[in-house]
């Protein structure tokens, strides 16, 4: 790899949408930007754009990003990925760039599931129906529902993740909060988020 391997110049979400419009697969915005799309405002600057799609649809990336170099990312190592090559289940990250000397332009994460049901990669017993997995902005950009995105964030729960949770708490439905509380309790029972989530579900008069 060259010296550009960790330099990023992410393409804009409009360009992403145009590229994926040419292929018939589900994709959605993930990461911190998904939280902002749910909130309806920019809560902070985002250095990159995280995208997600079902693992079964991964080959479509060669059509969406025709001519680009695609690499799998696992344990800090980047490996060139070519059409027809298998990506083993533990590997879920893909980086792309338009040329060997270019900065990285896109990151795509592969989601577990069968297309009808999304499953949490760290515990496949945690699931969500496909129709509840994403929401769509007025201009047609699909993004990950906040309870799933916050579940991903709960493992490390950095200060910025705590802020994301605080922003979302009073905008999420009771069903969303309950799903997240149960999922966080199952994956990391000691997380302080559990108490925050439970408190947010109490009736206001209590």
Question: Model segments located where?
Answer:
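Compositionally biased terminal segments of proteins
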Residues: 1-206
């Amino acid at each position: 790899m060259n010296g550009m391997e960790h330099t990023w110049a992410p393409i804009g979400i409009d360009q992403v949408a145009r590229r994926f419009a040419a292929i018939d697969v589900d994709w959605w915005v993930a990461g911190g930007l998904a939280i902002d799309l749910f909130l309806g405002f920019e809560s902070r600057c985002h250095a990159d754009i995280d995208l997600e799609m079902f693992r079964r649809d991964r080959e479509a990336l060669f059509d969406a990003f025709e001519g680009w170099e695609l690499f799998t990312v696992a344990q800090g190592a980047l490996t060139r990925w070519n059409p027809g090559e298998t990506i083993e289940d533990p590997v879920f990250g893909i980086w792309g760039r338009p040329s060997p000397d270019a900065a990285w332009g896109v990151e795509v994460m592969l989601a577990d599931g069968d297309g009808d049901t999304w499953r949490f990669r760290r515990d496949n017993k945690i699931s969500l129906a496909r129709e509840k997995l994403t929401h769509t902005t007025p201009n047609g950009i699909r993004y990950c529902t906040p309870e799933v995105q916050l579940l991903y964030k709960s493992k490390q729960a950095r200060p910025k993740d705590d802020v994301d949770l605080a922003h979302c708490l009073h905008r999420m439905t009771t069903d969303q909060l309950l799903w997240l509380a149960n999922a966080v309790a199952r994956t990391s029972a000691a997380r302080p988020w559990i108490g925050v989530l439970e408190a947010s579900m109490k009736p206001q008069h209590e």
